[in-house]
């Protein structure tokens, strides 16, 4: 139980630091807060609504991982390093892919809701 409690505190601390230090995290939390009520309006089924919220949460997860990679890379060196630059670019690409995927989920859900598909 103590291990679970410590993990919970670490989770809270990590999320709090990310919120304080990264605008993208704050923006994605706003998107997640907006997604909650919108998903229930747009979702044709309960499961579709859950999927819509989950895909936005997934973007937040990927952004947190990308932020962790960037912070670690910046800690290793502040000098320009092409390999670290490529690693950061890959993290950014992961966020981009997650955003496109989320956008497609929402687009198809809206199309389904209005009867286009």
PLM region descriptions:
Residues 2-68, 76, 80-82, 88, ...:
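Hydrophobic alpha-helical transmembrane segments
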């Amino acid at each position: 139980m103590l291990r679970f409690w410590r993990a919970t505190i670490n989770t809270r601390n990590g999320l709090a630091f990310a919120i304080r230090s990264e605008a993208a995290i704050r923006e994605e939390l706003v998107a997640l807060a907006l997604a909650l009520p919108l998903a229930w309006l747009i979702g044709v089924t309960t499961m579709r609504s859950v999927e819509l919220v989950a895909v936005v949460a997934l973007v937040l997860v990927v952004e947190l991982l990308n932020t962790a990679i960037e912070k670690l890379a910046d800690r290793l060196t502040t000098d320009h390093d092409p390999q670290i630059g490529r690693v950061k670019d890959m993290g950014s690409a992961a966020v981009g892919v997650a955003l496109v995927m989320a956008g497609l989920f929402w687009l198809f859900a809206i199309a389904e809701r209005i009867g286009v598909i």
